UniProtKB/Swiss-Prot annotation:
Source lineage: Bacteria, Bacillati, Actinomycetota, Actinomycetes, Mycobacteriales
Keywords associated with the record: Cytoplasm, DNA-binding, Iron, Repressor, Transcription, Transcription regulation
Subcellular location field: Cytoplasm
Cellular component aspect of the GO annotation: cytoplasm
Function: Iron-binding repressor of the dipheteria toxin gene expression. May serve as a global regulator of gene expression. Represses ripA under iron excess.
Self-association and partners: Homodimer.
UniProt name for this protein: Diphtheria toxin repressor
GO biological process entries: negative regulation of DNA-templated transcription
Length: 230
């Protein structure tokens, strides 16, 4: 039974991630993210639709029901709070944080979650700059939602810009090779870099080191101009 619950939570969290990244949630995208077969994904989505968690639209995109979205937000909140704990207090290697938090999100109790909100210094964003959602649901008031910047692939084409890295979405954290390249170049949340959005790729330069991201990963980088991005 627990395996079924975990599978449901993983699917809902993946749909939530895709929405955050500006990607249409399709069963094919879930199959890619979770490395599962098409038939397996279709069967699981059909079960989730029967359970009232998602709805398959005529264009085949997946829409979470209010119940499904509430569960997705709860799972993502626990995931990102776990990331903060693992980084800020335990001091786990940043390259291991995402995978470890994926385990914690399914077993963290509501009591522990509320306690984390009390002991952590920053519960607005994960260590990767991603907003921690649904804090009001556990009694934490926020004046406003944190800004999320703009996707690197949505920057003007061919123009060199000075920007600050504000967010690295989940798909980039999972790609250990590319994430390590960024880390080795000193590119992390809060780093100021020079960036050019070219056709099909984004080039980021920091301290003389140049990192190239193709669009399938560059969409997961969000930035803001050092002097503000409109």
């Amino acid at each position: 039974m627990k395996d079924l619950v975990d599978t449901t939570e993983m699917y809902l969290r993946t749909i939530y991630e895709l929405e955050e990244e500006g990607i249409v949630p399709l069963r094919a995208r879930i199959a890619e993210r979770l490395e599962q077969s098409g038939p397996t994904v279709s069967q699981t989505v059909a079960r989730m639709e029967r359970d009232g968690l998602v709805h398959v639209s005529p264009d085949r995109s997946l829409e979470m029901t209010p119940e499904g979205r509430a569960l997705a937000i709860a799972v993502m909140r626990k995931h990102r709070l776990a990331e903060r704990l693992l980084t800020d207090i335990i001091g786990l290697d940043i390259h291991k944080v995402h995978d470890e938090a994926c385990r914690w999100e399914h077993v963290m109790s509501d009591e522990v979650e509320r306690r984390l909100v009390e002991v952590l210094d920053d519960v607005t964003r994960s260590p990767f700059g991603n907003p921690i959602p649904g804090l009001a649901d556990i009694g934490l008031d926020q004046d406003r939602e944190p800004d999320s910047g703009i996707r690197a692939i949505d920057l003007p084409h061919g123009e060199s810009l000075r920007v600050r890295i504000v967010q690295l979405n989940e798909i980039l954290q999972v790609d250990q090779e590319q994430f390590s390249i960024l880390s080795s170049a000193g590119i992390r949340i809060g780093t100021e870099v020079d960036i050019i959005n070219e056709q099909g790729r984004v080039v980021i330069t920091h301290n003389g080191m140049m990192v190239e991201l193709m669009d399938d990963l560059a969409h997961a980088v969000r930035v803001e101009k050092v002097d503000g991005l409109n």
